[in-house]
């Protein structure tokens, strides 16, 4: 009697129209982003509750919110699916790019909601430019995503995301400690080095996303 030969299962093929986003969205670690969202909502609601929000307080809160939301999104790139999928028709860079879009888009939506609430509490006529502040948030988000995309190439689990958070917070702290002449976080909207700082942020903003694009490439085997 001949023993049936054991065949290696063929690579999983994703048929046309096979939904990838729902299982990918379920696989993302949303807990850090949910925790930061609750923190942002609580802090914005409780700061000077029942009174108008001072412009400098609102600016500080939005910067803290943008930094923490970027840190939380780093956890979305920890890909537990990679060990289970084996050979698959869906490249790693596609899965990781979708993770960036899903979690990053959610973080931006949360930040915009927080900005709208903060804006509604400011006194009439207060300068609070959404475009400039969104550039700051995009820089924090891009650095966190790029660092996380790099870290998960060398480590697995939450320790990779934590390494990315350390990199992001370290870079933010380094820019805060710069001399006043090159300060990148002016304390008052529209005054001092505000325009120059945001011209710098705008010019540098493509760099972390270019870094992210390189880090999302498929791993060489």
Residue ranges and their predicted role:
Residues 1-58, 149-154, 168-221:
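Hydrophobic alpha-helical transmembrane segments
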Residues 9-22, 83-87, 112-122:
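Hydrophobic, membrane-facing alpha-helical anchors
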Residues 51-55, 61-67, 98-165:
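Secretory targeting signals
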Residues 57-83:
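Hydrophobic alpha-helical transmembrane segments of multi-pass membrane transport proteins
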Residues 73-77, 145-150, 215:
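Transmembrane alpha-helical segments that form the membrane-embedded catalytic/substrate-channel core
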Residues 75-102:
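Helix-loop-helix units of permease transmembrane domains in multi-pass membrane transporters
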Residues 94, 121, 128-129, 213-221:
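Membrane-interface module
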């Amino acid at each position: 009697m001949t023993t049936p030969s054991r065949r290696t299962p063929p690579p999983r093929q994703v048929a046309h129209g096979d939904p990838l986003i729902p299982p990918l969205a379920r696989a993302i670690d949303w807990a850090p982003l949910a925790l930061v969202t609750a923190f942002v909502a609580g802090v914005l609601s409780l700061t000077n509750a029942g009174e108008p929000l001072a412009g400098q307080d609102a600016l500080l809160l939005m910067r803290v919110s943008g930094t923490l939301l970027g840190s939380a999104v780093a956890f979305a790139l920890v890909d537990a699916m990679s060990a289970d999928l084996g050979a698959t028709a869906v490249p790693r860079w596609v899965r990781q790019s979708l993770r960036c879009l899903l979690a990053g888009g959610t973080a931006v939506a949360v930040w915009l909601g927080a900005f709208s609430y903060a804006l509604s509490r400011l006194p009439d006529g207060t300068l609070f430019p959404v475009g400039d502040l969104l550039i700051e948030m995009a820089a924090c988000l891009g650095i966190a995503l790029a660092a996380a995309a790099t870290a998960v190439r060398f480590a697995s689990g939450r320790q990779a995301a934590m390494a990315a958070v350390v990199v992001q917070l370290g870079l933010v702290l380094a820019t805060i400690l710069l001399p006043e002449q090159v300060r990148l976080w002016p304390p008052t909207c529209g005054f001092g080095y505000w325009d120059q700082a945001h011209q710098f942020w705008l010019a540098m903003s493509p760099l972390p996303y270019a870094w992210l694009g390189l880090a999302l490439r498929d791993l060489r085997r």
